[in-house]
Each structure stands twice: as structure tokens, then as C-alpha cells.
A protein has these predicted regions:
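Intrinsically disordered, low-complexity linkers and terminal regions
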Residues: 1-136
């Protein structure tokens, strides 16, 4: 079965190396590193949550005036709020924890399948060499 995190964080093999895609809430970003893809996925999720809840993601934009030529003014984007930054960091940590747990579960399932295959094989061998008088 495919989990939601498998759909949100996909790995595509390419001739030049693996390509990671972060896909969530109708947004997509392709990255060359898994770390960057996790950060983008956290960004998509945090931005969506803040947008829906009405919390401010950024401080207001500020107009910066050039010190020598005042006609060359520009707008500087406001920095992210502390609440948004902390929420983003929490989301990254939670995503990493989910992925680590998933890897751990996959390793355990692999060991379980190997043990089960050995058991079935041994059982079939015992059934094949069973003496005729036994009813079991």
C-alpha cells in the first residue's frame, strides 16, 4: 500500500542521479537532494496551515530607499514570523521522524518475511519426509 508520505515525497531515478519531488496541496517542487525536498514539503504544509488559520506568515514588506539616490527605492520582503519559523522546524522534524520510523518498519518487515520464508521451507521439507504412520 502507498502511504500519504510516499505520495508527498517521491524519488525518481534519472541517468544523472536521483530526483526527489515534494508534492502537496497542489504544489510541486523537484529537488536533487532529499533534504531539500523535505524542507519544501514542510514549507508547503506549514504555509497551507498558516494560510487556512489566518496566522501571519511574514512581517509586512518595507520600502527601502537608496542612501545616495532616493529615486532608486525598492521593496524588501518582510521576514518570516517566529511562529512560522518554529512551526516549519517542527514540521521538518516530524517528517524526518515519520520517515525514520517507516525505514525501521520496512527493515523489520524484511526480517519477518525472511524468517517466514525459512519457516515455510523447513515445514515443507519436514512434510515431505514424514513417515507414513503419522496422522499429523
Amino acid at each position: 500500500t502507498v502511504s500519504a508520505i510516499d505520495l508527498a515525497l517521491q524519488k525518481h531515478p534519472t541517468p544523472v542521479g536521483d530526483l526527489f519531488a515534494a508534492i502537496r496541496h497542489g504544489r510541486m517542487k523537484r529537488c536533487f537532494s532529499r533534504d531539500t525536498a523535505i524542507r519544501y514539503l514542510a514549507f508547503f504544509m506549514t504555509s497551507r496551515a498558516f494560510g487556512r488559520s489566518g496566522f501571519k506568515q511574514r512581517f509586512p514588506d518595507v520600502q527601502v530607499i537608496h542612501p545616495l539616490n532616493p529615486e532608486l527605492s525598492s521593496w524588501q520582503r518582510g521576514a518570516v514570523t517566529t511562529e512560522y519559523f518554529n512551526a516549519h522546524q517542527r514540521t521538518v522534524r516530524r517528517l524526518r521522524r515519520i520517515l525514520a520510523r517507516k525505514r525501521e518498519m520496512q527493515k523489520w518487515c524484511k526480517k519477518w518475511d525472511a524468517m517466514h520464508d525459512r519457516y515455510v521451507k523447513e515445514r515443507e521439507e519436514l512434510q515431505a519426509c514424514k513417515p507414513g504412520g503419522l496422522s499429523r
